[in-house]
A protein has these predicted regions:
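Conserved active-site and SAM-binding loop architecture
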Residues: 1-178
């Protein structure tokens, strides 16, 4: 694991070329809640951070979200050139990230969507997984027993272990085939 501020991290100095990159850009400026006039999740954050039609950021908080997304995509693309067999998966709750103009720089990619409760989690949390290896996730709908906004922050951002296991098994199976 690498834990760093990706806006400052010199990824070109990494002493190896990764086979897999997983990324979770902050969701707060891409959630559908950020397109409304209220912010249910965090009262200290601005209510409406982005224009829902143009995706234009309306404040510094949204600009930071865009910069983090752009940098994440830049890092993925840098290592894709170094390793054409690189597999990536970038997750974000279903919202407006898929409408971001910056996502075009990630192409080609596919989007798999699932609910966390499909993986025995107590949260419903519909989430998109942008990837380049034909990721298949459980489909359908379910109802979680916890509202995401009422869950402690550390749990709110956690991906269910069974979902992580499923993703990495698919990456491994895909590497064997290619």
């Amino acid at each position: 694991d690498i834990v760093a501020d990706i806006l400052k991290w010199n990824y070109k100095e990494l002493d190896f070329i990764p086979d897999v990159i997983t990324a979770s850009p902050p969701c707060a400026t891409f959630t559908t809640m950020s397109l409304t006039n209220r912010n249910f999740y965090d009262k200290s954050k601005p209510a409406r951070v982005r224009n829902s039609e143009t995706m234009k950021p309306l404040n510094d908080y949204a600009i930071l979200g865009d910069n983090l997304l752009k940098r994440t995509i830049t890092i993925i693309n840098y290592f894709r050139k170094k390793n054409p067999k690189l597999k990536f998966v970038m997750e974000n709750p279903r919202g407006s990230m898929n409408k971001s103009p910056f996502m075009s720089a990630l192409r080609p990619y596919e989007t798999a969507t699932t609910y966390y409760c499909m993986y025995s989690d107590t949260r419903t949390k519909r989430t998109d997984f942008f990837n380049n290896f034909n990721l298949k996730l459980r489909e359908g709908s379910c109802r979680g027993t916890e509202l995401v906004r009422l869950v402690p922050l550390c749990k709110r951002y956690a991906i269910p272990q069974t979902l992580i296991t499923s993703i990495f098994k698919q990456i491994e199976n895909n590497k064997i085939k290619s």
